[in-house]
């Protein structure tokens, strides 16, 4: 019994099929370059400091003056690496608050302390606490800008720290600020699961 001799057409079919199979398998195991570039670009723009690992780098307290100092870094639709209420700044009652705002993203951002009740506001311009907002709250500050918010808080309450640029807070750029009557010192970190 003899095997059939490959014809000219059949001679190229096997290498072609093997080449296509290699291409398909090889491509399916690699990351898409455009996705990898977007992910690395986002990682590069996201602040390296996350509160769950560096609380003391973001919040401090002077007990003598009852002053909480908080560093608020605006990243790509996040605060200090958190968004959508996933972090909470907890402060003692009647504290004096100093928020050092750092705009670290290429998209304009601002900050405002808004009510913690009801839906997340679409934009700023209606602070829940007097003087608790940055300059250019609706238009936002450019990358590299800094600002300082100084205000006092009441005995208790739940608020949101939002980006006041229209659509940013509803897009997830907000975290909680809670005035806890039992708190003796401030803290900042992931919001406890309820």
Range-by-range predicted roles:
Residues 57-60, 86-113, 147-155, 159:
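Beta-strand cores of secreted/periplasmic/IMS beta-sandwich domains, seen most often
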Residues 29-50, 135-194:
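Extracellular/periplasmic metallocenter environments
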Residues 40-70:
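A eukaryote-biased signal for short, well-structured alpha-helical docking elements
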Residues 106-143, 169-172, 176:
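Histidine- and aromatic-enriched segments that form or immediately flank copper-ligand environments
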Residues 63-96:
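N-terminal edge beta-strand
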Residues 74-76, 95, 102-105, 113-117, ...:
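A mature extracytoplasmic/lumenal domain signature
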Residues 2-16:
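Bacterial N-terminal signal peptides that target proteins for export
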Residues 23-26:
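C-terminal motif of bacterial Sec signal peptides marking the signal peptidase cleavage site
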């Amino acid at each position: 019994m003899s095997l059939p001799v490959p014809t000219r057409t059949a001679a190229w079919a096997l290498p072609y099929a093997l080449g296509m199979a290699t291409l398909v398998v090889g491509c399916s195991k690699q990351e898409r370059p455009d996705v990898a570039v977007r992910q690395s670009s986002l990682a590069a723009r996201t602040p390296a400091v996350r509160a769950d690992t560096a609380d003391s780098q973001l919040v401090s307290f002077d007990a003598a003056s009852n002053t909480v100092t908080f560093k608020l870094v605006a990243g790509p639709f996040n605060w200090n690496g958190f968004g959508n209420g996933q972090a909470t700044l907890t402060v003692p009652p009647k504290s004096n608050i100093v928020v050092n705002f750092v705009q670290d993203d290429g998209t304009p951002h601002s900050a405002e302390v808004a009510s913690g009740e009801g839906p997340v506001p679409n934009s700023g311009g209606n602070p829940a606490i007097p003087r608790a907002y940055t300059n250019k709250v609706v238009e936002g500050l450019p990358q590299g800008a800094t600002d300082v918010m100084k205000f006092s808080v009441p005995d208790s309450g739940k608020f949101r720290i939002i980006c006041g640029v229209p659509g940013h807070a509803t897009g997830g750029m907000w975290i909680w600020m809670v005035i806890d009557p039992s708190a003796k010192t401030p803290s900042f970190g992931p919001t406890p699961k309820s």
